Amino acid sequence: MYLEKLSLTDFRSYAQVDLTLEPGVTVLVGYNGIGKTNLMEAIGYLATLSSHRVSSDAPLLRFGTERALIRAKLVRGGQSTVLELEINGSRANRGRINRSNPVRARDILGICQTVLFAPEDLALVKGDPSNRRRFLDELLVSLMPRHSATRTDYDRVLKQRNALLKSGRSGKFTAGHEATLDVWDQHMARAGAELLYARLELVERIRPHLKAAYAQLTDGSKEADAIYRSTLQGILDDDGAGAGYAAEPAAVERVEDLRALSVEELTQRYVQAFAASRRKELERGISLVGPHRDDVELILGEAPAKGYASHGETWSMCLSLRLASYYVMLDDARTGGSAPILILDDVFAELDVQRRRKLAAIVSGAEQVLVTAAVDADIPDELAGRRVKVVPGGIDESESR
């Protein structure tokens, strides 16, 4: 798959901009703050319905406007698809496929597939568990769009259950509330089990690719790995942080391997866990058990990457996670899926020469690679390709080559 045309209206700094692209490598060059990342952000948003920079849609709308429009023409196997996504400030976002009648935004998921590398990726290692959960869920939805509904259902039930728990904290909890909480426990157990089962499967798909990617980017002296940590295993504390599992491998060996359980069995585990934690949850007014508090522990050698990896090792781990997601998507592409568009947003400026060259050599063979840089000198020779000059408010075609 490759992106042939991109058009933005009232998105971020752009009142209107049109960009024509082609397969292979395209490097967008322009000084910092000119709007290169805004272009890449729009493509990523079209693929995931979320920004890698902000948590809400409001900053995506050009100041003083009520809506933004992203329009893209994608080509796959000689067939073209036109996607439109309207981002609204006051109502639900809407999409269009080949100029159809409007559809829900989530109905366009899975059509445009991207893997986006950005400086913000450092949070995958250094940040809190929510960054790693988001990484998993975005990849999950890209591979299987139906899981967007799975996550939406879980978030809806979690919100309702938390509201009920808060009423208990305020002293308004009655026998009727207890019965209602039992019902919400069942709903949340089922929704949580479906999400957990999908995440566990995905992590197992990621792991071999993560190890291979890290070996490609480094000298191979350390091995990278990823292990899913669930609140069902009792090794996360009440704030979702690891309760010493990295320092106590013997304790980890004793925890239940959830990968062997079915959705039905995971549902029952959640029902039991909710019952066991009810008193504490009522005291705190929040749900303490569930996928919303899980983590993915990233391992480098024998130690957790977070807190132990050097700056260079942290970057290698982040890049390896993104490459692993790319390889997982390629696995699907071989059985009817689409090869994703690779986006490298201001990444090379953050890397030493060795990592630049190794990363460039790995990604250069992708069907389409979009790179942003402040100066040409940041781009390794392995990524020779078309250059596009980004200027205030748009593209300078006369300077592009």
From Swiss-Prot:
Annotated keywords: ATP-binding, Cytoplasm, DNA damage, DNA repair, DNA replication, DNA-binding, Nucleotide-binding, SOS response
Gene Ontology MF annotations: ATP binding; ATP hydrolysis activity; single-stranded DNA binding
Sequence positions that bind ATP: 30-37
Described purpose of this protein according to its UniProt entry: The RecF protein is involved in DNA metabolism; it is required for DNA replication and normal SOS inducibility. RecF binds preferentially to single-stranded, linear DNA. It also seems to bind ATP.
GO biological process: DNA replication; DNA synthesis involved in DNA repair; double-strand break repair; SOS response
Taxonomic lineage of the native organism: Bacteria, Bacillati, Actinomycetota, Actinomycetes, Micrococcales
Cytoplasm in keyword set: yes
Top-rank taxon, per record: Bacteria
Gene Ontology cellular component list: cytoplasm
Subcellular compartments: Cytoplasm
SMART domains registered for this protein in UniProt: AAA
InterPro entries in UniProt: AAA+_ATPase, DNA-binding_RecF, DNA-binding_RecF_CS, P-loop_NTPase, RecF/RecN/SMC_N, RecF_2
Organism, scientific name: Arthrobacter sp. (strain FB24)
The name this protein goes by in its record: DNA replication and repair protein RecF
